[in-house]
Amino acid sequence: FIASLGAFSTFGIFGLYASLAPSFMGQMLPWHGPAVSGMSIAVILFLSAGVQWLARPLHTKTCVLWGLGLLALGNVWLMATTLSNWPVLFILSLLTTAAGHGLMNLAGIAIVNKVATPATRSGLLSTYLIVGYIGTIAPILAVGWLSDYTGLSWAIVAFCIFMSVFTSSLCWLAYQTPVIEPA
């Protein structure tokens, strides 16, 4: 449950950067163009992969707690960037989002592997990924719809508030959950 909702939030937060980067980065940063938006996405993915590699020895629950916490913080930084247009905050947002993204991807797959038996592994992994893919789609559609009424900046602020509260709540639930032993 927590792993799948973690995937939802992880994919949703990355989806915001990926799908709306050209639009909102043009408003927040003094630099423009496809290279800037492409660079932010590349930074998230490269740093995410690096964090996953470095975090391999960490306990899964540690990865979940830190990952969700960093995703919440990344949304706070992105909201602050949206309101202030300060590029340093955007860099902090990218770094914390990338670290949270990597930790949650590592932890999510690890949790699926821990709770699945050989007979249920493919179904559980598919379900986990489907929830993640819905997380890529639904929040972005909501931001697009909301931006028609409030403007893009306020839609991003609303997204950041929601995702910060959501990932913080998941972090608290994960903290309360006992450690999962392999099936």
Question: Which residues fall in each region the model found?
Answer:
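Pair of pore-lining "gating" transmembrane helices in MFS-fold secondary transporters
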Residues: 1-14, 91, 95-96
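Small/hydrophobic positions within alpha-helical transmembrane segments
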Residues: 9, 39, 43, 47, ...
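A late C-terminal transmembrane helix in Major Facilitator Superfamily
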Residues: 101, 109-152, 159-160
